[in-house]
């Protein structure tokens, strides 16, 4: 975060890091921000979550055990090479398309590759892309 002057960093394990909090983990700051948003929008948390899930259906973190993860990640990128808008390796492999995106990264704490996928308002596309990526990743 310091190298990139990032304002925020987060993990699926519910760790939240903030530049203005000395780059330290805080669970209280996200809750305060959510409470502020609830008040501003005059909505319950369940309503905010439902709205977000409908706008951006997501897979959640899907874990794979893969023998040669670096090679498999390159295989995934090659498979989509004529389809994506752009990609980067900031935190694993992140690939962005017109109406969906995914991140594939090697876990730092377990022998796993983690997939997170998100679409724009399209649950069918989400399920289709999860199946496609699972098929590629399991094709060792």
Language model regions located:
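Phosphate-binding and adjacent anionic-ligand microenvironments
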Residues: 1-140
């Amino acid at each position: 975060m310091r190298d990139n002057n990032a304002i925020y960093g987060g993990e699926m394990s519910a760790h939240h890091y903030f530049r203005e909090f000395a780059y330290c983990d805080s669970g209280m700051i996200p809750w305060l921000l959510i409470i502020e948003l609830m008040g501003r929008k005059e909505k319950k948390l369940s309503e905010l979550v439902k709205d977000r899930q409908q706008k951006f259906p997501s897979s959640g973190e899907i874990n794979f055990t893969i023998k040669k993860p670096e090679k498999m990640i390159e295989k995934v990128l090659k498979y989509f090479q004529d389809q994506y808008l752009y990609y980067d390796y900031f935190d694993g492999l992140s690939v962005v398309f017109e109406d969906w995106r995914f991140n594939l990264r090697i876990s730092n704490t377990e022998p796993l590759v983690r997939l997170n996928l998100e679409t724009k308002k399209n649950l069918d596309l989400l399920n289709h892309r999860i199946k496609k990526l699972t098929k590629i990743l399991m094709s060792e």
